[in-house]
């Protein structure tokens, strides 16, 4: 299931019926389904101490979906939007991936409607890891799908400070790319530590 739901939308999951969901999974001969823990807007679809549950959701949607999937004999893979969290990006603009001209990727700035990719060389990574840990500790997920994560050159303050601190040249694309690869490698290693 793919849905990225703004805080402006109301009655989230209001008509969800666990029995009907389970029946639909069986009727469709589904063997695996991906269910949302956190969308691109940054909202969680379950109670959380780490993030914020969607303001117009009043029950544990992913918990009910996982239970229904398992009752139907279907694997339940949990989706977390890793590289996008618009709620966090707006509150922490300095942690967004920047181009060399300091514009953002996907949207050129915060006045243009779109999502803003977050840099994994910032405190955002710790926030994301806490969400992953909470999800895996609280739910019986059969897998984890972390979306929007890849090697991406970045010129945010954190990346520039890292390069300069290591005696590297922020104007040298090879050195910026090497940092991007290191940042992604660190991200995957730290995710693996949480998952294992």
Where are the predicted features?
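Short, small-residue-rich loop/turn micro-motifs
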Residues: 3, 37-39, 148-150
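Hydrophobic faces of well-ordered beta-strands that scaffold small-molecule active sites
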Residues: 1, 33-35, 76-80, 144-146
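Aromatic-lined carbohydrate-binding/catalytic grooves of carbohydrate-active enzymes
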Residues: 26-61, 84-101, 110, 153-154, ...
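Active-site-adjacent "subsite" loops/lids of carbohydrate-active enzymes
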Residues: 78, 82-139, 177, 189
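Active-site neighborhood of glycoside hydrolase catalytic domains
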Residues: 117-196
């Amino acid at each position: 299931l793919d849905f990225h739901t703004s805080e402006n939308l109301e009655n989230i999951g209001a008509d969800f019926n666990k029995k009907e969901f389970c029946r639909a999974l069986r009727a469709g001969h589904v063997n695996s389904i991906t269910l949302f823990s956190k969308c691109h807007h940054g909202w969680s679809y379950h109670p959380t101490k780490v993030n914020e549950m969607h303001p117009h959701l009043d029950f544990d949607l992913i918990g009910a979906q996982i239970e229904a999937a398992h009752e139907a004999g279907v694997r339940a893979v949990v989706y977390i939007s890793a590289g996008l969290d618009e709620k966090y990006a707006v509150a922490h603009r300095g942690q967004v991936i920047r181009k060399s001209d300091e514009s953002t990727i996907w949207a050129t700035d915060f006045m243009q409607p779109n999502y803003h990719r977050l840099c994994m060389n910032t405190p955002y990574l710790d926030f994301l890891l806490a969400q992953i840990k909470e999800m895996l500790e609280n739910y019986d997920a059969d897998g984890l799908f972390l979306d929007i994560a890849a090697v991406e050159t970045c010129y945010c303050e954190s990346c520039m400070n890292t390069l300069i601190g290591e005696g590297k040249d922020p104007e040298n694309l090879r050195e910026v790319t090497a940092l991007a690869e290191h940042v992604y490698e660190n991200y995957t290693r730290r995710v693996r530590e949480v998952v294992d």
